[in-house]
């Protein structure tokens, strides 16, 4: 009997911990919060503020879609993540997930490459060529119809980015 007591105590502690963790998770998913890399793959709030200077909160509204809110809680834009919609699209060295910032009228403000396995030199060529700015100012529909030439010396990387962007915009409501 004495050997079972520590086992039961351990099980009880684990169950209490799981209950607290689940409650915390449910509470967090039902409220607005300041994004962190752990909670939200949109880099950091400071970096998000390059597209949305007045951004104070981000709230998930549906799969890979986040409402960006100002201090008063007003939606000032949207952030779209290309993953999971583009997970099967490869650049030079695997998928290249994107963060796409849209203003409150649905125009693209910024396309940002998230953590990936692309060769840094190829990705640098894409960024330096201004490739990511090719869709700025366009609506999703306009961006879907725009063909952008691949960056010389980084063809696979740039095509992967373009296809990932289009895959995400195709499912935008």
Annotate the PLM regions.
Residues 1, 15-18, 56, 60:
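Detector for methionine-enriched segments
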Residues 1-8:
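N-terminal secretory signal peptides that target proteins for export/translocation
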Residues 12-26:
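Bacterial N-terminal signal peptides
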Residues 26-159, 163-173:
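Flexible, solvent-exposed loop/hinge segments and secondary-structure transition points
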